[in-house]
UniProtKB/Swiss-Prot annotation:
This protein's name: ATP-dependent Clp protease ATP-binding subunit ClpL
Compositional bias (Polar residues): 47-57
Gene3D superfamilies, per the entry: 1.10.8.60, P-loop containing nucleotide triphosphate hydrolases (3.40.50.300), UVR domain (4.10.860.10)
Alphabetical UniProt keywords: ATP-binding, Chaperone, Nucleotide-binding
Ranges for domain UVR: 336-371
Residues given in the record as ATP binding sites: 126-133, 457-464
Amino acid sequence: MNNGFFNSDFDSIFRRMMKDMQGSNQVGNKKYYINGKEVSPEELAQLTQQGGNHSAEQSAQAFQQAAQRQQGQQGGNGNYLEQIGRNLTQEARDGLLDPVIGRDKEIQETAEVLSRRTKNNPILVGEAGVGKTAIVEGLAQAIVEGNVPAAIKDKEIISVDISSLEAGTQYRGAFEENIQKLIEGVKSSQNAVLFFDEIHQIIGSGATGSDSGSKGLSDILKPALSRGEISIIGATTQDEYRNNILKDSALTRRFNEVLVNEPSAKDTVEILKGIREKFEEHHQVKLPDDVLKACVDLSIQYIPQRLLPDKAIDVLDITAAHLSAQSPAVDKVETEKRISELENDKRKAVSAEEYKKADDIQNEIKSLQDKLENSNGEHTAVATVHDISDTIQRLTGIPVSQMDDNDIERLKNISNRLRSKIIGQDQAVEMVSRAIRRNRAGFDDGNRPIGSFLFVGPTGVGKTELAKQLAIDLFGNKDALIRLDMSEYSDTTAVSKMIGTTAGYVGYDDNSNTLTEKVRRNPYSVILFDEIEKANPQILTLLLQVMDDGNLTDGQGNVINFKNTIIICTSNAGFGNGNDAEEKDIMHEMKKFFRPEFLNRFNGIVEFLHLDKDALQDIVNLLLDDVQVTLDKKGITMDVSQDAKDWLIEEGYDEELGARPLRRIVEQQVRDKITDYYLDHTDVKHVDIDVEDNELVVKGK
């Protein structure tokens, strides 16, 4: 048969070219290609020789075979599955997967869908962290154990990484070729089931995004999925399922949804017990049952934005890793190597009759052996509930360990602690303390904030200060106070400042400074709405839902939990009732400014009374204590005479303005004068403050 490429003239030209190249000194630097594939000079010479001894057709076949060899023996399509994924069933046989507890129902549903003749493609839908991937691993273990329908008892579950299908596909058609190889691999193996985690990524995956007609992964898979030629298990979240899969109705009907809900606290404890051995072996830390229960209980209470069992497992893992880092493991290999070296030294010492040296070496060997035995688990660290509390505190910033240890005593004494900081407002302090004790002791309904209060009274009597002290006492620092000045929320756009803008408006993607976002990041907070009477009526409408249901939906549709917050609103409205005003008089005044349904949502409406001079005596002591804290940084002590305190009270007393004028007098007459004295006497270590000629004077030592 005549061939225009492989004829005798071509063979002679090629042999002559090879002969010339073999005589060149630069052959080692040259590269040779056949059909675009690089071959070695030896293979090319062999092919040339074959071309001279055989027909043109045989020469062409030899060239093609060499190209295939150089391309690499990639083997069958089954090997391609191994290249792009993990065989979960094989890992289950090898005992590499964690046990799956409490998911029998979901595993059974998934197995039933897989055993169908057509459209046998389950998709696990659930929020992040509920254990969708673990269910697939549990199915792989069930296949190994034989606890599945006969139709899938021989299946191999291959976890496929979508990005590996796209890797290296810079040329048109390369991605489609990978998908075809994947499909052929599944068909040829006859027992492979593909698992795509985050399966919503298949929408548009591999498409060029242009009008050129390039197909994405989902478009290529649809025909094979509908005919049952391949079987796929998918996993995705509710939002991604709604926003991606459900929009493609042709793809949706090829999948069967398996809903995965968050496990209960009891089931999560059993899950932790099932995986405990793996964590103990990995970290060399003992994890008792009470620690596992604390992981679940504390993660539910203090990490509400995440779901079980993921958050409980994370707390357990972090705690064990922290304890393991504090007790570094002995390097077993190095220790055994050192023992072997010492054994040799001991034998040499005995041979040389150096018995004292041999005895010392034996003591060192025994010490290393004891150390090695201890590292094998006899003296491993044991986790405690307090360790779990410390982990929660590091994750959230909430002083959980402090509240855990002495919570009952702290609850009993909360009113005394607040009363020492908030002077002259015993009724307000007691009402707030009762609400907090009721919540922390577990005797409220649990579906509302810890407490919601309306503080009413004149300016400068401690309304804002009580909110600050609550944040410090309950949550450990004053940064837990979220303060909103309602004068900034009086316009019609106030709602967008609270919950963020909705879709279609500017700033939809940037809601970082809204109230809902602040509470999402710090769910344990005191929220202060200062001068609430100045707020837009729409703000008050939003607060109805917060105080009644304990949650609020932001502009992007996320439900924010307010159940661990304290809501405090302050107002100057109706403060003129005087010290002997009754509750009905307060309510009568409040109804002039607020709707009845708003007032009825509060746990308590608290009137703050005018401060008298006796109350200012305690307040001036607190203000002077703050001055002393500042002086401590300079190593200076301070004594203030009673006459000086009386003078400050007399100068700073104003019944209408409360304690703020007194704070201003202390700043001007005490802080400023101490500053002036310090600048003239930088070596001063002690100052005395007294009154002379109706003037405050500072003297130093």
